[in-house]
Structure formats: structure tokens, C-alpha cells
From Swiss-Prot:
One of its GO terms (biological process) is positive regulation of transcription by RNA polymerase II. The gene is DEFA. The keyword Transcription applies. The keyword NAD does not apply. Residues 3-57 form the MADS-box domain. Mutations in defA cause transformation of petals into sepals and stamina into carpels. Transcription factor involved in the genetic control of flower development. Acts in conjunction with GLOBOSA (glo). It is found in: Nucleus. This is Floral homeotic protein DEFICIENS. Keywords: Activator, Developmental protein, DNA-binding, Nucleus, Transcription, Transcription regulation.
Length: 227
């Protein structure tokens, strides 16, 4: 029974496509090696897969550059010289751009002005004025950002202060606030550790002796406890 003719077209499934590529690449390289050994031929194969991977084969008796040199000699073309000429032309353009930039920099620093005409000087002044304007705008932008950041920090500090004041006022409403008893352990009263002076805070009537005030009309006064 005759085999059906296989239709050659792109394999849509990516996995199947990669498997087929790998198998046929190995088969092609094997055939190239056999041709190189059996017939003493110089064979070079360069392949790039759909995933941009490079695969190549070169006969053991030669090198890629030698084979390209023989190709150029056989067909009468010089691939390297045309590429070199393009590189030289590109380098020439880059050098011209570099010279112009260096000249503009010197002129903006007040140098190399003798060869400039009136219109060129006017244009240079306009360019420098525009550059100065952009620099000022950038400076003001940076300062504005710093001011906004500082204002945010100030608002955060003010919010923390308000919360502390509210918490302090709320605790002042507690009649037991200011006196720490801790079940008779007076070492836990506000003060310094290691036998230092201990401090006790008492709420006094508003008409007590003025010399006992802590300042600002507050009725919360602290006393040092003696041993």
C-alpha cells in the first residue's frame, strides 16, 4: 500500500514544532557530517530556530571564516569591505555630531565666540535664556516638593500633639490619676530607679497656695517623697 503524500506546512502546535525542529536538525547535521567525511566536502550550516536560538555545523577540516572567504572569492563579492564602509560612514557622522556638541558647550561657556555672526549670537542668547528658564522652573518644582513634604510632616506632628493632649485631658478627669499605689509598693511610684528620689503627683484644690502650682494655673502638682 503506497504511503500518502505528507503536506508540508507550518506546524501550529508549538511543542510539536520544537520537537520536529530538533529531530530534523539533528538529522540534517548528521547528513552534513556524512557528506563532509565521505566526499571530503567543506560544509557549513547555520540555523536559527523560531525561539531565536542559534545552531550551526561546520566541517571539522575548516572554519567558518575560511568558508566565508572562499565563498566571497568564488562569487566575486566582498562582504567585509561593504560592512566596513558602512561602519566608517556611521563613525564619520558620530564624530561630526560630537564636534558640534563640543562647540556648543564651549559657546555656552563664553568660549569660541569670535567666529559667530550677529544672528548666531542672538540665537545663542535665546537658547541660553530658554535653558535658564527651564532650570528655574525645575528649581521651583524641587522647592515646592520640599515645602509640601515639610508641611505634611508638620501636620503629622500637630496631629500627634492633639492626640496626646486629648489623652492627657481624658486622664485628668480620672480622680485616681496621678497617684500610683500598686498595693502599697511605693517603689513603683514615678521616680528614678535604684533608690533615687521618688515623685508623687497629687491633685490640689484650685485655691491652694500659689507657690505649689506647677505653672499655668494647673491643679496638678508633684512632690518628692522623702525616705
Amino acid at each position: 500500500m503506497a504511503r500518502g503524500k505528507i503536506q508540508i506546512k507550518r506546524i501550529e502546535n508549538q511543542t510539536n514544532r520544537q520537537v520536529t525542529y530538533s529531530k530534523r536538525r539533528n538529522g540534517l547535521f548528521k547528513k552534513a557530517h556524512e557528506l563532509s567525511v565521505l566526499c571530503d566536502a567543506k560544509v557549513s550550516i547555520i540555523m536559527i530556530s523560531s525561539t531565536q536560538k542559534l545552531h550551526e555545523y561546520i566541517s571539522p577540516t575548516t572554519a567558518t571564516k575560511q568558508l566565508f572567504d572562499q565563498y566571497q572569492k568564488a562569487v566575486g563579492v566582498d562582504l567585509w569591505s561593504s560592512h566596513y564602509e558602512k561602519m566608517q560612514e556611521h563613525l564619520k557622522k558620530l564624530n561630526e555630531v560630537n564636534r558640534n556638541l563640543r562647540r556648543e558647550i564651549r559657546q555656552r561657556m563664553g568660549e569660541s565666540l569670535n567666529d559667530l555672526g550677529y544672528e548666531q549670537i542672538v540665537n545663542l542668547i535665546e537658547d541660553m535664556d530658554n535653558s535658564l528658564k527651564l532650570i528655574r522652573e525645575r528649581k521651583y518644582k524641587v522647592i515646592s516638593n520640599q515645602i509640601d513634604t515639610s508641611k505634611k510632616k508638620v501636620r503629622n506632628v500637630e496631629e500627634i500633639h492633639r492626640n496626646l493632649v486629648l489623652e492627657f485631658d481624658a486622664r485628668r478627669e480620672d480622680p485616681h490619676f496621678g497617684l500610683v499605689d500598686n498595693e502599697g509598693d511605693y517603689n513603683s511610684v514615678l521616680g528614678f530607679p535604684n533608690g533615687g528620689p521618688r515623685i508623687i503627683a497629687l491633685r490640689l484644690p484650685t485655691n491652694h497656695h500659689p507657690t505649689l502650682h506647677s505653672g499655668g494655673g494647673s491643679d496638678l502638682t508633684t512632690f518628692a517623697l522623702l525616705e
